[in-house]
Amino acid sequence: MRMQLKEIHNKTKVVIMDRVKKQNVIVILLALLACVGMVSCGDDESFIVGKPSNIFSNVSPKIVGKYSIYYDEKGRVSLVTECDEYGCRKAFFDYSPADKDCDVRIDIAEENYDEKLSLHVSLNKNGYAEYVNEIEDDDIEEWKFEYNSNGQLIKMVRSEGGIETTTITYQEGDIAKVVQESKFDDSSTSSTIEYGTEKIENKGGVMLFDEMLCIDMDEMGFAYFAGLLGRPTSHLPQSNKSVGSSSGGYKITTYKSFSWSLDAKRQPVSVFIEENYENTTSSTKIYSFDWGE
């Protein structure tokens, strides 16, 4: 009788252990599924969509050239203003939009012309913009973005003015070539970006697409300050050259140079920009930076 009870006890113990193991497996599987459903899990627990420290080397810049950046209580970008000689634009960020077709909504208002538009941004698993609907009145333009394994933007397709495709080529973490092609008028622009013999590390994560990298980002440029357009280049650009070609065979070449002033941490304080078109005099401007430290 005692032997039978011992045998029953052992069998019961085995059954209980099996159940515990199965429950542990289920818990682990559920945890993994939860991890897959998050934008970032395990590798960077501090990742927050809209937080500029995702790209700006753990700083929250206040001023980057003609852009001023403002933050909410969670450290996310809430407002970006762009001001130049033509006026100001304001971009407002909503990370919990009522719209069900996007993860982030950016509302942009242009003060001088009383124009308003909305960017409905859908993110990929890394928290970068993948699909965007740009809505202005009854018009909808589409954007699509692709990134390399390092999280850097390599392709942009936009429907504005016909299908416009921008292809970006990198060398050692830096944008080396940009080709923009439009199916609407068969025009194209081919640009090369140089980083000089003495390269300057891009410690601030500066990526001024239109101004320095020959990428026609337009309204989507605001999204970069919230970390929504991928990782920055490894170094700061020191010059670029763009050759634009029309369907009629007309070509125009543009040159730009960038002279950087750095602080003790090797972050930009200012940059002197000189631009030259063929057979024209040069124009210059100075951009300043405030890293909010």
Residue ranges and their predicted role:
Residues 1-17:
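Short, Lys/Arg-enriched N-terminal segments with co-localized hydrophobic residues
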Residues 18-27:
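Bacterial N-terminal signal peptides that target proteins for export
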Residues 28-29, 253:
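A general structural-boundary detector
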Residues 29-35:
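Hydrophobic helical h-region of N-terminal Sec-dependent signal peptides
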Residues 36-40:
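C-terminal motif of bacterial Sec signal peptides marking the signal peptidase cleavage site
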Residues 43-293:
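Buried hydrophobic residues that stabilize the cores of well-folded domains
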